[in-house]
């Protein structure tokens, strides 16, 4: 038989076993929030890792890897008269620079694809440039051919006859005449971090990628210069 409850006896708490106290509910809620936050952080990290692993590569990375390897190969020859050459440490495709030939026809650096180019920017107001020009002319005479050309681009912005007169005065006979009267070619290389003053020289491989860059003049026709450029061309 069910025992009778005394008149003053409190009712039994039938919810005590099923309803946790409020502090416990708050603790459970906080744990759930922490778990959700941790899961979100893990998801963000995983998405970031996936994105890094699968992001598109710079097209220059693959195309210009050979130029970086060429730079490493010739690094031991960066000495003496060409000690100031900075060989490429990372793949860099040289901008497709625009300039003109002696007849005023439009050219681009990409017109030399398949050939190694020693690109030189010079001006008549630049004393080191004028002194360097005979060495560049001699280098073209020694090594110029189907696989290599010294491309010296004048960037005088006034009096287009002045650079031509200078080249005639110093008997430059082997260099073709190229010019950019806007000097935009210099600004493009400067923006790319490859030009800081005059003269500026960039050795460009047949794919249009930087092998090395030099700020300032050099005796390019010296034994050091000829050996360096010949090595870049893989000539024996």
Kindly label every feature range from the protein language model.
Residues 86-91, 96-117:
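A short beta-strand-turn-helix
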Residues 131-171, 181-189, 227:
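Structural microenvironment flanking redox-active thiols in thiol-disulfide oxidoreductases
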Residues 92-94, 112-114, 145, 158-161, ...:
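Extracytoplasmic
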Residues 165, 169-174, 180-232:
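Thiol/disulfide oxidoreductase modules built on the thioredoxin-like
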Residues 121-123, 153-156, 180-181, 214-217:
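Active-site-proximal beta-strand/loop segments in catalytic clefts of secreted hydrolases
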Residues 1-93:
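N-terminal targeting signals for export/organelle localization
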Residues 113, 121-138:
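Conserved redox-active cysteine motifs that mediate thiol-disulfide chemistry
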Residues 116-117, 148, 199:
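Alpha/beta-hydrolase fold active-site loops
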């Amino acid at each position: 038989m069910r025992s009778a409850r005394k008149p003053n006896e409190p009712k039994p708490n039938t919810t005590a076993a099923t309803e946790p106290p409020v502090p416990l509910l708050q603790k459970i809620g906080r744990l759930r929030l922490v778990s959700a936050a941790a899961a979100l952080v893990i998801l963000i990290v995983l998405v970031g890792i996936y994105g890094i692993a699968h992001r598109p590569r710079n097209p220059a990375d693959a195309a210009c890897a050979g130029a970086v390897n060429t730079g490493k190969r010739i690094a031991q020859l960066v000495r003496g008269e060409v000690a100031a050459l900075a060989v490429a440490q990372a793949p860099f495709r040289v901008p497709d620079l625009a300039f003109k030939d002696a007849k005023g026809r439009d050219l681009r650096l990409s017109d030399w694809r398949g050939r190694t180019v020693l690109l030189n920017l010079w001006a008549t107001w630049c004393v080191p440039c004028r002194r360097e020009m005979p060495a560049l002319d001699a280098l073209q005479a020694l090594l110029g051919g189907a696989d290599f050309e010294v491309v010296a681009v004048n960037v005088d912005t006034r009096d287009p006859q002045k650079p031509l007169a200078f080249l005639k005065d110093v008997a430059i006979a082997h260099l073709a005449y190229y010019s950019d009267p806007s000097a935009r070619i210099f600004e493009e290389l400067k923006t790319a971090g490859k030009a800081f003053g005059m003269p500026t020289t960039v050795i460009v491989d047949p794919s249009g990628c930087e092998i090395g860059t030099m700020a300032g003049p050099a005796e390019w026709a010296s034994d050091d210069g000829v050996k360096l450029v010949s090595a870049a061309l893989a000539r024996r």
